[in-house]
């Protein structure tokens, strides 16, 4: 009894766990699985946790999630879905500049749509069906010249063409459209709120905005009203358009790609390199900042403070951290360079925060717990590839193998990706090599369903993780880590086994 009845009070609490500074002070490189976060005190519900975090110096996201610029992960469908959920998608550049710019071009989820598809009286029903197949909508305004700024004469909606067949494709729009005198319009200068109220009262699908000369200047869609209601966290720019990023290389011909992307409305460019500490990237940062000073630039990839310093000095607005830690990446194996991701994120974030530069943890994310750990180590956002691959919105077609529904997933350093386009070769400085050295592999991943179901699971998981830690926001989580209040503990291999599913003959692991 005497051994444990030392005091009648509970004022004494022994020191427990390690601060991040102590954990990463030794020479061991740690991954996310090598440590755990010790729980804190809960005095709030999980849904109260604020996940707002900085993507770059000037762009803030309500959800700290980014889809990776890989050709089996992010094109327009993924970027749209990620932005609607409060994150952002980075369109890959393993394609022509024109294709990438078209994927970025903003026509979805806007307040006032100032560049809609417009047709003239000389267009036919077939043209409308072609536009519907290409853009996914059929509410098309008709003007005298078929351009914005021309006199509005009508609109073609799905109700006008629903029951038409191929034999009607040659019919002119003047015969099927809803005429101007039947339309509800709003005057130029109307506020977005007023226009939305008019659209709600009219019960129409589209609301054209016209000037005093009855010329079309913009349009508003009812579907956008519904999206505003259904996606309150959506990432939008000052024009109420969804945020979108794009990756570019660091070579001379990437300057043409950059011009097309800025014309398409890109919000942030990611300089895509496996090793970002190079004269090529520094020169490209200087070029972008001189030509497009307001454009946000993400540099990388880096894993040390020394690498980060050069890019911060060059003027980057955020840093992408990770080298060789992705599930399809073999850089560490082939090149003998890289760093375990836990250590890389902590070391770079601890240095970059002194200059107000946010850090993106890129790679090595296998579970929602890894996301929480990356954020707790100082990352502002987390970039995911394999975790989002094989979702409905990821590029590529599903196929079946042994009865399992799969999608292809490959590293941008794989021979498959490098053979498709030279952009992947430039990322690994190998476009001029006679012999290509693969730094990635190709594989397949089981169908995960839609992003619209998977990302809410990730968001809820992050919130519950922060709740267990006792952090009501991501900014509080980081401040707890840097102040030493957040305590960590290394895990032995036995501890890792214990922390997973064990001791069962068989089991089913359903995450959501």
Swiss-Prot record:
NAD(+) binds at residues 272-274, 322-324. The keyword Oxidoreductase applies. The active site is at 329 (thioimidate intermediate), 427 (proton acceptor). Pfam families: CBS, IMPDH. Pathway: Purine metabolism; XMP biosynthesis via de novo pathway; XMP from IMP: step 1/1. Keywords: CBS domain, Cytoplasm, GMP biosynthesis, Metal-binding, NAD, Nucleus, Oxidoreductase, Potassium, Purine biosynthesis, Repeat. SUPFAM superfamilies: Inosine monophosphate dehydrogenase (IMPDH). It is found in: Cytoplasm; Nucleus. The keyword Mitochondrion does not apply. K(+) binds at residues 324, 326, 329, 498-500. InterPro entries: Aldolase_TIM, CBS_dom, IMP_DH, IMP_DH/GMP_Rdtase_CS, IMP_DH_GMPRt. GO terms for molecular function: IMP dehydrogenase activity; metal ion binding; nucleotide binding. Its cofactor is K(+). GO terms for cellular component: cytoplasm; nucleus. It catalyses: IMP + NAD(+) + H2O = XMP + NADH + H(+). HAMAP family: IMPDH. NCBIfam families: IMP_dehydrog (TIGR01302). Catalyzes the conversion of inosine 5'-phosphate (IMP) to xanthosine 5'-phosphate (XMP), the first committed and rate-limiting step in the de novo synthesis of guanine nucleotides, and therefore plays an important role in the regulation of cell growth. Belongs to the IMPDH/GMPR family. This is Inosine-5'-monophosphate dehydrogenase 1. It comes from Xenopus tropicalis. The gene is impdh1.
């Amino acid at each position: 009894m005497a051994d444990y009845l030392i005091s009648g009070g509970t004022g004494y609490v022994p020191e427990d766990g390690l601060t991040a500074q102590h954990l990463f002070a030794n020479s061991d490189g740690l991954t996310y699985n090598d440590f755990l976060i010790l729980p804190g005190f809960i005095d709030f519900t999980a849904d109260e946790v604020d996940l707002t975090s900085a993507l770059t110096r000037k762009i803030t996201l309500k959800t700290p999630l980014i889809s990776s610029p890989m050709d089996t992960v992010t094109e327009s469908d993924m970027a749209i879905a990620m932005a609607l959920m409060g994150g952002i998608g980075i369109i890959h550049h393993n394609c022509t500049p024109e294709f990438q710019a078209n994927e970025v071009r903003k026509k979805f989820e806007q307040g006032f749509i100032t560049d809609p598809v417009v047709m003239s009286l000389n267009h036919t029903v077939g043209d409308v069906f072609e536009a519907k197949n290409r853009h996914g909508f059929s509410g098309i305004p008709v003007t005298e010249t078929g351009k914005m700024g021309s006199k509005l004469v009508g609109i073609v909606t799905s109700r006008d063409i629903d029951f038409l067949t191929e034999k009607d494709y040659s019919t002119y729009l003047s015969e099927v459209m809803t005429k101007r005198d039947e339309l509800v319009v709003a005057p130029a200068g109307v506020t977005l709120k007023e226009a939305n109220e008019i659209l709600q009262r009219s019960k129409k699908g589209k609301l054209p905005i016209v000037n005093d000369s009855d010329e079309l200047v913009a349009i508003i869609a009812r579907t956008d009203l519904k999206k505003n209601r259904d996606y309150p966290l959506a990432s939008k720019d000052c024009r109420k358009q969804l945020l979108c990023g794009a990756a570019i290389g660091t070579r001379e011909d990437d300057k043409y790609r950059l011009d097309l992307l800025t014309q398409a409305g890109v919000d942030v460019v990611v300089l895509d390199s496996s090793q970002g500490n190079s004269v090529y990237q520094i020169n490209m940062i200087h070029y972008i900042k001189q030509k497009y000073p307001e454009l946000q630039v993400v540099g990388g990839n880096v894993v040390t403070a020394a690498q980060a310093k050069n890019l911060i000095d060059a003027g980057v607005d955020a840093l992408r951290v990770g080298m060789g830690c992705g599930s399809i990446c073999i850089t560490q194996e082939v090149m003998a360079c890289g760093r375990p991701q836990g250590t890389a994120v902590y070391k770079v974030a601890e240095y970059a925060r002194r200059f107000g530069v946010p850090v993106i943890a890129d790679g090595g994310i296998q579970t929602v717990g890894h996301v929480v750990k990356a954020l707790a180590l100082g990352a502002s956002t987390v970039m995911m590839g394999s975790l989002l691959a094989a979702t409905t919105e990821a590029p590529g077609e599903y196929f079946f193998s042994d009865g399992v529904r799969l999608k292809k997933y490959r590293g941008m350093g794989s021979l498959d990706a490098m053979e498709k386009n030279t952009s992947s070769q430039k990322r690994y400085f190998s476009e001029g090599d006679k012999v290509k050295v693969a730094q990635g592999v190709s594989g397949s991943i089981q169908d995960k369903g839609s992003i619209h179901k998977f990302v809410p699971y990730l968001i809820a998981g992050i919130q519950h993780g922060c709740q267990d830690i006792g952090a009501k926001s991501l900014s509080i989580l980081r401040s707890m880590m840097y102040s030493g209040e957040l305590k960590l503990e290394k895990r032995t291999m036995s501890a890792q086994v214990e922390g997973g599913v064990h001791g069962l003959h068989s089991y089913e692991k359903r995450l959501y």
